[in-house]
Amino acid sequence: MAVAGFVFCRPLFGLAIVLLVAPIDAAQRHTASDNPSTYNIGGVLSNSDSEEHFSTTIKHLNFDQQYVPRKVTYYDKTIRMDKNPIKTVFNVCDKLIENRVYAVVVSHEQTSGDLSPAAVSYTSGFYSIPVIGISSRDAAFSDKNIHVSFLRTVPPYYHQADVWLEMLSHFAYTKVIIIHSSDTDGRAILGRFQTTSQTYYDDVDVRATVELIVEFEPKLESFTEHLIDMKTAQSRVYLMYASTEDAQVIFRDAGEYNMTGEGHVWIVTEQALFSNNTPDGVLGLQLEHAHSDKGHIRDSVYVLASAIKEMISNETIAEAPKDCGDSAVNWESGKRLFQYLKSRNITGETGQVAFDDNGDRIYAGYDVINIREQQKKHVVGKFSYDSMRAKMRMRINDSEIIWPGKQRRKPEGIMIPTHLKLLTIEEKPFVYVRRMGDDEFRCEPDERPCPLFNNSDATANEFCCRGYCIDLLIELSKRINFTYDLALSPDGQFGHYILRNSTGAMTLRKEWTGLIGELVNERADMIVAPLTINPERAEYIEFSKPFKYQGITILEKKPSRSSTLVSFLQPFSNTLWILVMVSVHVVALVLYLLDRFSPFGRFKLSHSDSNEEKALNLSSAVWFAWGVLLNSGIGEGTPRSFSARVLGMVWAGFAMIIVASYTANLAAFLVLERPKTKLSGINDARLRNTMENLTCATVKGSSVDMYFRRQVELSNMYRTMEANNYATAEQAIQDVKKGKLMAFIWDSSRLEYEASKDCELVTAGELFGRSGYGIGLQKGSPWTDAVTLAILEFHESGFMEKLDKQWIFHGHVQQNCELFEKTPNTLGLKNMAGVFILVGVGIAGGVGLIIIEVIYKKHQVKKQKRLDIARHAADKWRGTIEKRKTIRASLAMQRQYNVGLNSTHAPGTISLAVDKRRYPRLGQRLGPERAWPGDAADVLRIRRPYELGKPGQSPKVMAANQPGMPMPMLGKTRPQQSVLPPRYSPGYTSDVSHLVV
């Protein structure tokens, strides 16, 4: 069953294949059969030789199977080119279009003009019939709005601008003057040069710029006015497009102005090369095969055959139009054939044949011609197609060139001016600017005039400039020998690239402002200022080698330590001070308790010495703790017990550590250097973190601003600081000094100068974005190399180092700052004012306490006087009583004595008279206080120790008056005194025989 099914399906499968393939073959056969088999090629030629060669070429083409498919035949239809363009139009219609030509090959005599070829192009283009020109080189044929179907195997004249660029690159000329006629071709070659140079120099370091464009009317009679302008320009390289007749006038007048001699370079196009007065040494271009009509005819025919062959294989070609009277004819195949023609790239007799979008020949070869004596033309180079690289290549033999003035050495191509227009800008310490007074007529010897020109009213304000860059300029002008006029930047800016409305235009375009704009627009020759070298600026201007290497850094104000009245307390934290204060009183309390409860402290043993030291009370313990802490000596009692004394020793060690730590920390905190910066550098987290309350800024539009824009990792920081940016560096630095701006990011040279001038300012962190300051010059300036070499010599000789010391590091000011930094900081009144205030408070407290004590003492004295009066009265009364008692007792004893005597001896008489000589004491009249013999003061001093119960009596006084106690202040032991009552004293006598009762 499977085999039967397969056998049944095979016919169906084969039928399907046939049905699918048949339409394709039918379509191919239909296409091939629908295309014409014969093609008429028209020719509008200038002479019979060209007509004959055209016919021969067509015949040979039919046998070339590489270009002609089978069953396809080409036929030629030719007419003679008429000088009358109208007649030419009729001939094209009647003899070419009527014969259904598919394309037309056109040539004409060079002297007949381009009107007839243009007529052929207009007529054929109206019917979309392609036209291939072999001799028309005017720029007008490149306009596809007019010549819609025109191609040519020769390049237009303005394509020589491409060769000019190659020659300038070969000779390394960077500045040129272009001379061209004001016709279509002259303006076309200028436009081609400017347009092509934009892309040509993308990969070339040295760019040729047009210094001056001189446009003249064709058929001129004199070129003198233009030569005057050319002579004042720097460039001595002239690129000229002119007809042969105009070139004769230009060369004639240039010779009279001596502008065709030594040092000048003339590069001209083909027409000017054939002038009969072309100076010796002129270089010109000559198109290869320019006059080879036969070669161009053959190449045009084969290009056409190649296009038709490809078109036949791809699509159907409709028959060409036949009637010029039918204006409704729209031959689409003709338009398609024109596109196929433009895409051709073949190797022909005239070289590599290819076309651009305008149908103009590309890859055309040129000979570089050098004019010698007697108008001899010598080929010194070729501009030809390199098949290996598939591009054009310039080859010039420099040794064979004879330059103007019969020189073998290549001219510099530029006249180096010796008087330059210089610009600068105020930027301390590089440029100081001072306005001249009304009575001043000249600047100081170390200054140079630098007026500020007002662009609005063309007035000038007189200023004088001095500084680092001015000294450099003075030395530079001497070294490389130039004079100058110095002026200030008109807008006071270095310049940045901004969008701006063009004059008279509605569109925005980018342009440079400030110093850079003046240089780019060639209103200045040189910029002598602290101009940072960066890629954005180097694209538009030249820089010398750096005269000052620097980078970017951060300026901030030095952090100042706030000095308060309690600065002396800052070495310890508040918590530590509180703990110390608490510890003093806790230790005092523990000392008191240990001494009180110790068996060897408060309580004395019964057999202990009466002179043993007393135990420590609470007030003495507090005094002891403070005395040890403050190391003031201890004048009060010390701990008596062993346990309290151990604690006292530990407390003394604690006090020693605390005092030593305080002293050391005070020295470190107040005497050592303060921290120099708050920021560690550009990578400081506070700069990168936009949430921090830290303001930083730079100068808007400056090189530093451009640096931050380039750095992706600094984009967040730049967005934050962009709103704070300043117009000038001076404003930002002032705000840093005032504390309004915390960090100013700018060139290190300027900030180092500010830091050396003001000891309160400091640069933070390391340099970043390293670059250098260079002298700016115009692109291609002849002074670039000379300035660079001079600056290198200045570095080697030490001149730049001298300028650094003189201007940037600010001489003695920097030394003073260094001295300030090296000198140890000393404590001042700000730091220690609190200590003096503390002493003052202590003095005031002492005075207050003494006043209180005096008042209290007066009150006590009054009270004591009352007590003394009462005591005196009591003592007087007591003395009287004692006296009476004594007398009575004496009488009684006398009586007893007499009784005894009477009983033993004979009775006698006792005289009561007083013997004053024998008993002087008894002869004195005694008051109550002198009832006892002796001095009253001694009597009272002896009696007071027994008056312990009396109010107001000091225990210390009582203790001091005890027998055996040390005498006050002398440390001596008082002698033992009798404490017997007066009646038992030695002054008392039992002899009372002298008393009379």
Swiss-Prot record:
<keyword id="KW-0407">Ion channel</keyword>
<feature type="topological domain" description="Cytoplasmic">
    <location>
        <begin position="595"/>
        <end position="651"/>
    </location>
</feature>
<feature type="compositionally biased region" description="Polar residues">
    <location>
        <begin position="987"/>
        <end position="997"/>
    </location>
</feature>
<comment type="function">
    <text>NMDA receptor subtype of glutamate-gated ion channels with high calcium permeability and voltage-dependent sensitivity to magnesium. Mediated by glycine. This protein plays a key role in synaptic plasticity, synaptogenesis, excitotoxicity, memory acquisition and learning. It mediates neuronal functions in glutamate neurotransmission. Is involved in the cell surface targeting of NMDA receptors. Plays a role in associative learning and in long-term memory consolidation.</text>
</comment>
<feature type="glycosylation site" description="N-linked (GlcNAc...) asparagine">
    <location>
        <position position="345"/>
    </location>
</feature>
<feature type="glycosylation site" description="N-linked (GlcNAc...) asparagine">
    <location>
        <position position="501"/>
    </location>
</feature>
<dbReference type="GO" id="GO:0045211">
    <property type="term" value="C:postsynaptic membrane"/>
</dbReference>
<keyword id="KW-1071">Ligand-gated ion channel</keyword>
<dbReference type="GO" id="GO:0004972">
    <property type="term" value="F:NMDA glutamate receptor activity"/>
</dbReference>
<feature type="glycosylation site" description="N-linked (GlcNAc...) asparagine">
    <location>
        <position position="258"/>
    </location>
</feature>
<feature type="glycosylation site" description="N-linked (GlcNAc...) asparagine">
    <location>
        <position position="481"/>
    </location>
</feature>
<feature type="signal peptide">
    <location>
        <begin position="1"/>
        <end position="26"/>
    </location>
</feature>
<keyword id="KW-0812">Transmembrane</keyword>
<keyword id="KW-0472">Membrane</keyword>
<dbReference type="InterPro" id="IPR019594">
    <property type="entry name" value="Glu/Gly-bd"/>
</dbReference>
<feature type="topological domain" description="Cytoplasmic">
    <location>
        <begin position="853"/>
        <end position="997"/>
    </location>
</feature>
<feature type="binding site">
    <location>
        <begin position="530"/>
        <end position="532"/>
    </location>
    <ligand>
        <name>glycine</name>
    </ligand>
</feature>
<keyword id="KW-0325">Glycoprotein</keyword>
<feature type="topological domain" description="Extracellular">
    <location>
        <begin position="27"/>
        <end position="573"/>
    </location>
</feature>
<feature type="binding site">
    <location>
        <position position="747"/>
    </location>
    <ligand>
        <name>glycine</name>
    </ligand>
</feature>
<dbReference type="GO" id="GO:0017146">
    <property type="term" value="C:NMDA selective glutamate receptor complex"/>
</dbReference>
<dbReference type="GO" id="GO:0007616">
    <property type="term" value="P:long-term memory"/>
</dbReference>
<dbReference type="GO" id="GO:0042391">
    <property type="term" value="P:regulation of membrane potential"/>
</dbReference>
<dbReference type="GO" id="GO:0072375">
    <property type="term" value="P:medium-term memory"/>
</dbReference>
<dbReference type="GO" id="GO:0042331">
    <property type="term" value="P:phototaxis"/>
</dbReference>
<feature type="transmembrane region" description="Helical">
    <location>
        <begin position="652"/>
        <end position="672"/>
    </location>
</feature>
<feature type="glycosylation site" description="N-linked (GlcNAc...) asparagine">
    <location>
        <position position="693"/>
    </location>
</feature>
<keyword id="KW-1015">Disulfide bond</keyword>
<dbReference type="InterPro" id="IPR049872">
    <property type="entry name" value="NMDA1-like_ligand-bd"/>
</dbReference>
<dbReference type="GO" id="GO:0007268">
    <property type="term" value="P:chemical synaptic transmission"/>
</dbReference>
<keyword id="KW-1133">Transmembrane helix</keyword>
<feature type="glycosylation site" description="N-linked (GlcNAc...) asparagine">
    <location>
        <position position="454"/>
    </location>
</feature>
<dbReference type="Pfam" id="PF10613">
    <property type="entry name" value="Lig_chan-Glu_bd"/>
</dbReference>
<keyword id="KW-0628">Postsynaptic cell membrane</keyword>
<dbReference type="InterPro" id="IPR018882">
    <property type="entry name" value="CaM-bd_C0_NMDA_rcpt_NR1"/>
</dbReference>
<keyword id="KW-0675">Receptor</keyword>
<comment type="similarity">
    <text>Belongs to the glutamate-gated ion channel (TC 1.A.10.1) family.</text>
</comment>
<feature type="transmembrane region" description="Helical">
    <location>
        <begin position="574"/>
        <end position="594"/>
    </location>
</feature>
<dbReference type="GO" id="GO:0035235">
    <property type="term" value="P:ionotropic glutamate receptor signaling pathway"/>
</dbReference>
<dbReference type="InterPro" id="IPR001828">
    <property type="entry name" value="ANF_lig-bd_rcpt"/>
</dbReference>
<dbReference type="GO" id="GO:0048149">
    <property type="term" value="P:behavioral response to ethanol"/>
</dbReference>
<dbReference type="GO" id="GO:0055074">
    <property type="term" value="P:calcium ion homeostasis"/>
</dbReference>
